[in-house]
From Swiss-Prot:
Gene3D superfamilies, sorted: Nucleoside Triphosphate Pyrophosphohydrolase
Similarity comment text for this entry: Belongs to the Nudix hydrolase family. NudF subfamily.
Cystine bridges: none
One example of a Gene Ontology biological process annotation: response to heat
PROSITE patterns: NUDIX, NUDIX_BOX
GO terms, molecular function: ADP-ribose diphosphatase activity; ADP-sugar diphosphatase activity; magnesium ion binding; protein homodimerization activity; pyrophosphatase activity
InterPro entries (UniProt xref): NDP_pyrophosphatase, NUDIX_hydrolase-like_dom_sf, NUDIX_hydrolase_CS, NUDIX_hydrolase_dom
Subunit architecture: Homodimer.
Residues annotated for Mg(2+) 2 binding in this entry: 112
Cited SUPFAM superfamilies: Nudix
Protein name (Swiss-Prot/TrEMBL): ADP-ribose pyrophosphatase
Amino acid sequence: MLKPDNLPVTFGKNDVEIIARETLYRGFFSLDLYRFRHRLFNGQMSHEVRREIFERGHAAVLLPFDPVRDEVVLIEQIRIAAYDTSETPWLLEMVAGMIEEGESVEDVARREAIEEAGLIVKRTKPVLSFLASPGGTSERSSIMVGEVDATTASGIHGLADENEDIRVHVVSREQAYQWVEEGKIDNAASVIALQWLQLHHQALKNEWA
């Protein structure tokens, strides 16, 4: 047993035995079957466990923030996965994109800001990263906040070859956070990013002054 340094958990990667990993489906996304054993809290090793894991890569998320005007830029687009559980499948979100091999989080954030919102990002600051739903997918999302001039944000954007149809919204920081509290913004990356901004906006303004 090798406990991870500085983490308040019991076990580490050395306490997992990967028996096999098989790709069941590969398309735009992939589905992998993991067969593994892991150490139990009683010190024994488990029986073989089988889990199907959705593999879609990792995402970069950008919170576009104008520290002078105290405004954020949100994008609106259809998300068909929200159809069954939300009042509408059109969601208000952060700028985001999948990280390709050789790209950094900042590379993707700056590229997607142009593609999805027509925004040029000035300074950036890492916020945090999180596992989207570790019970079923390996995806990790990394959030950055980016300094923008919100007066330049407007219009309809997106790549036609990716069937994107994206509308830009510029709202006050207070309004965006109110929508979080009211459940009108209910996707994880946007909720986390806007909650972080609500806690740190003054320090960020001082840093970027």
